[in-house]
Each structure stands twice: as structure tokens, then as C-alpha cells.
Amino acid sequence: MSRWRVAARLARQSLFSRDHPVRFIFYLHELVLRLPVGGPAVMADQLHHLQRMSLRPHRTLRVVPAALGVHAAINGSFLLMEFAEFRPVVYLEAETSSLFLETPAEIEAYQRILAMLGEVALGEEESRERIAALATELYADREDHDDRL
């Protein structure tokens, strides 16, 4: 990953610590929570980090169950950014480029996807429970496993 992308992601994280933080809703497919990245200790830490972050104000994390199968949002991640003073924008990021979508038809398509995700995703508490269950299922046999938030 390029340095500017890392810098951009870190800058986005700073939105959480503002005096008036931005409201975020995250939808994560259950399978991404199962995808091993960086080894078992890293994955266990990441799952517990998600649990902790989901408890903070202005952040909602909802898990889309794997049992639902393929759905409209399976094509990749996106950000729908809505502003008080400006029209909404969708941001797409690929390996070597990024794209902003601004036309009403494009925005409506992504709003429909989010509405569908809102209907099928687990609720906030259920999502935290699912993440905890995955951490236990996948990593509980490790000596360094700790279920505490």
C-alpha cells in the first residue's frame, strides 16, 4: 500500500477524535472477519479492536451474516459520505486508483445497497456478539487469547 494511502487512512481515523465527531456506520461481511490476515494473534487483536471501537459513540458496526450468501454489496467496499451543506458523494478505492461518484443515479444506487444492508445485517449488539463468538471460535485455543474488551 502506498504511503499516501496510509496517510489518507490515518487522516480519516482522526475524524473520530474531533470535538464534533462524524457519525459512521460500518457494514462488515462476516467472511472478512474470518479471513486470516497477519496470523492468529493479529486477527484476535483485530476482532477485539472492532468490538471496542463499536462501543464508542458515533460509530455503528453491523455484521452481514455469511448465511445470507451473495448480495449487492459483495462487489467491494465503498463510502457514502453525506454532508449538511453539500450533495452526497460515493468514494470507491481500488488497488491503484480511487473514484468519486456524484450523479444522483449513482448515489441512489449506493443508497439502495445501504438500505438493503440495513435490513439484513445483524443489530449492533448481535454484531458485537458475533465478533466475540468468532474470536473465541477461531482463536480461543491460543495461550495469548483474551476475551476481555
Annotate the PLM regions.
Residues 1-149:
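Hydrophobic protein-protein interaction segments
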